[in-house]
Each structure stands twice: as structure tokens, then as C-alpha cells.
Amino acid sequence: MAIEKELLDQLLAGRDPSEVFGKDGLLDDLKKALSERILNAELDDHLDVERLEGGPANRRNGSSKKTVLTGTSKMTLTIPRDRAGTFDPKLIARYQRRFPDFDDKIISMYARGMTVREIQGHLEELYGIDVSPDLISAVTDTVLEAVGEWQNRPLELCYPLVFFDAIRVKIRDEGFVRNKAVYVALAVLADGSKEILGLWIEQTEGAKFWLRVMNELKNRGCQDILIAVVDGLKGFPEAITAVFPQTIVQTCIVHLIRHSLEFVSYKDRRTVVPALRAIYRARDAEAGLKALEAFEEGYWGQKYPAIAQSWRRNWEHVVPFFAFPEGVRRIIYTTNAIEALNSKLRRAVRSRGHFPGDEAAMKLLYLVLNNAAEQWKRAPREWVEAKTQFAVIFGERFFN
């Protein structure tokens, strides 16, 4: 409902912007007046309901003062009371000291990568609110329950494509700051939309860790993954085939190219990349192997022998790529979504230095993912062609 212009003119008459929007200005006065009006209306309604229900006689019994935090200020409210003590306001509950928008503001700032100290300074500078670091941590800790629910939510029966990738995060563990891997699984559904299946902080290395992750996915309802795209994760192929025996494990071509370029001087990179293209764009596995051999024996292969060695080590999981038609290859090769996702996660953790523990890291990374969730839902342009080819290649498995 729009506020009448004449009423606004009366409220703003003779006031400059600082008197309206500043601390203890008109906006704060209005918020206080409206809140107290709502509280009194709530008590009237409460007393009317008790009378209609034939309860014991009850009536107003004065008021009490209560200081609460809102999203923009600290405010002292006059809270009406009833004689029987049965009134518990909905606007601001009896033992509540913060309006919900205050918590939402803190969580929003935290999700944007701001540290506890930065949030504290921001609230003090903009709103004149002095909030302790413990309170900010307590507010953000309320997210942990949502993290648990999200990490254990039911999954789809089948995912045509799942990218498994990792970022490195510094986390304090047993008195030492360790550089831990945080793994993320980004799935493409049958309609081309995307879903983040979960986040896992590395506790053990290799197949044992990945077996636990795969069993977790299965216990949450996932019965099949058609193609899993990974970046040389130790123990991953053995673990996924133990739980999802029909899954094709495919090395991420983009990561393999990047790894190859780590051996190459900067001035040579623009020439080496086209030379590698002949390998992964070959028509089939046999032609791809011949292209690899030609590269290995050629000028760049002789100058940078570690490149061909890297491709040969991963060749078993490069080969599946050649069996797919162009539409499916393009989807596997196009890693824009996972790259954008990792970029957001890295940007959020960059200013942190290190996290005090695994829970603190999970809390922030979950909030970053949750804020970006809408972006992952859109199907990529390439999916229209790829979907038809997935259906032909995988048949009934694709439609589960």
C-alpha cells in the first residue's frame, strides 16, 4: 500500500536527509512508533481471544522497557504487559533481543566474505551499533543446522554428469594450520539445470575418503551417475566404481591442459595449446593416441617431455572422451559453471587467512553456495544437443 504524498510531505517538512536517515532520525522514530503500535495491537488481540475462549480474567498491566537490535539501529521499545503474564509478542518474542532482519544482515555480510571483525566495524560505522564478536559468531552459527540439513537432503535417482573439484582452504586443526582440500560436487540434471550435491572437507586421503563420499551420495538416494568428471583425484576411480559400477570416469580435459602448461614457459604457451588441441579433438581414441605420439616426438614434446608423460599417466581416463559425440564432448569440456563456482568460493576465503575449524569453513562456503544457487539452475545452451545424445548413449539409465 502506497503512503499518501501529503503525509510524507508533513513528515519530511523542514528536515534535512541526516535528520531522516541518520542515527535516532525520523526513520528510527517511525520504526519505534510502528513497532510499539503493533505490540499494543497484538496485546489487544491476545486479550480478546482469551475473553472469547472463556479463560481467566486478564487485562493490561503497564509496560516494560526493552532494548533491541534492528538491521539498522539499536532501539528501546515500550513493551505492553498483561496481568496474567500470558502475552508473548510475535513481533519481538519475550526473550528475543534482536529483530530477524538484524540476523539476516549479519549473515548476508558474512556470506560476502566479511570477517567477524569487519562486520563489527561495519555495524559500528554505519549504524552506531556496538556488537560483540561473540554475538556475531552466535548469529552465524545458526546457519550450521541449515548446513546439516542441506548436506543430508535427498538427491535425484540419476545424474547424467557430475563434476568433482577441489579448492584449498587453510583450517586450524589440532593446533596447526593445515592446507585442507574442500571438495565440491556440481551435478547436471536431465533437464540441464545444475545442483550442488555437497561439500566435503578432506579428512583422510585416497580411496577411503572417496568411498565414504560415494556411499553418502547413494544413501541420500542417488542410484546412478552416468559420467563423473574429475581432476586426477587420488583413489576416486576405485571408490566410485565400487559404489556406482556403471559410471564412466572422465579426466577433466581443461584441468589436464592447465596442468600441461605448468611445465611450459609463459612465452611458449600460446603455441603449445594449439599443439595439444590435436590430441583432445581427435575423432576417436586411436587418432588421439597417434596425435599424442606425434606431439611427444615433435618439437614441443621434446622440449617439454613432462607434458606427454602427464597425458599418458591419465590416458585411461582420457579415452572415454573420444567415444562421445561432439555435443557430449562440449558439455564435458565446458567447465564454466564449476570454474565460476570455485571462483566465488576462493574469493570468499581469500580474506580470511585461515579458519578456526572445519565448521567455520563449511559455514561460510555453504552461505556462498546458497547465495549463488539461482545461477546454477539455468541450463547451458549446449544442453539441448547433448540431452538427445545422452538419451541415445545411455538409454533407460538417462530417464531414471
Curated annotation (Swiss-Prot):
Gene Ontology molecular function: DNA binding; transposase activity
Keyword set, alphabetical order: DNA recombination, DNA-binding, Plasmid, Transposable element, Transposition
Keyword DNA-binding: yes
InterPro entries, alphabetized: Transposase_mutator
Family annotation (NCBIfam families): transpos_IS256 (NF033543)
Function: Required for the transposition of the insertion element.
Name of the protein in its database record: Transposase for insertion sequence element ISRM3
Organism lineage: Bacteria, Pseudomonadati, Pseudomonadota, Alphaproteobacteria, Hyphomicrobiales
